């Protein structure tokens, strides 16, 4: 997969280390046995990080905040948060330098105190330079929920300009988009977006200094379908062809009225 991502011209990759079903792709070090080392005898997260480092790609970790498998999530929320922080501590300590943590699921229990201060402080103590992202979901796109967060998210939605005048630090933004309708691998989901749509979304993201996070779901053996690899490689070819426009200059606020999908760049 690493070679495919290189051809796709990726700057970073986000791996789902644990999703809402509670299964971990990393060694949970005794927290539970519901993880990859206990089922297939492999630490998938370590393999992922090693591959990223080999190919010069920054590894980021998606990690669920909600957990359908862990009983304490429903019965003792404070105890669950201790379990969650121990899980994150394992990822912070055992896999070298991590580019970022991409959290998701707080929207499932919005009225609870998620003790974000404790979680983010833990991460900073082990990984001071890592980015911390917490997906605000479709209903709250572009909102910054905590001062320690480094990016806002636009899940399946067009990014908007961010007012940084009152911010003590630079806040990034990112649009995450699926290729078909599902986030994970779905064998019978053929509702693929066109390459034109994906390229247009990518261009719009860069207009607003936003990153484009393109999701494809690997099969059970870790491989990608031919159509997934093809889409990634075409996006990579297009981004390499337009590298200067996408990654070097800064976008301006000037709009081309008769060509709404075009934008003007300035150097320096």
Task: Please identify what each model-predicted range represents.
Residues 1-268:
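Mature catalytic domains of secreted/periplasmic carbohydrate-active enzymes
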